[in-house]
């Protein structure tokens, strides 16, 4: 199972929101997903190579894209986003969103390598639930955007340390060393960017009603599982932490 993770920070109704967005795609589906993404980029955005015309949530869902759709009847960026969500469905993907408005969690990470911040920890728990329930005996691979920042390196080291130092059977379900890839050459990371953008819009006060159909489609791709314990609570992998 391939997991692709991205981050976003947005101001919604005057409130700062931080969100992690992730996509899980079965490894045997990923080449097909990449082929679908190339077809989308070629038809809708005029790309001649897979790495051209990077798809990003902020661009696809910009107000200007909706204005163009209203004035001219279509928008290439909105079509690309629509078809991307369709490709996630057809290639058996699941999506994950952890969002927060809590001042202490807004950075989404810790400054050091010895502790994983709560948003990332909750995301990892959800990943593990998917692996335990849907892919037992297989290993998941965590993939991040290679931006070359020290903060990214620190987060990767913190996740690796957490997996190897704590109980939880992480090594049974994951390769404990995260991968970093430039997002322009990774359809999975571009999908995670779109999911992160929409995921932040789950925050109260969402002031862009035109986004609601896309948000609902994103919700439909989330994973739902029962958390072990007395309460046996049902958990859906698009939620707030505080």
Indicate residue ranges for each PLM-predicted region:
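Phosphate-ester processing/binding pockets and catalytic centers
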Residues: 1-242
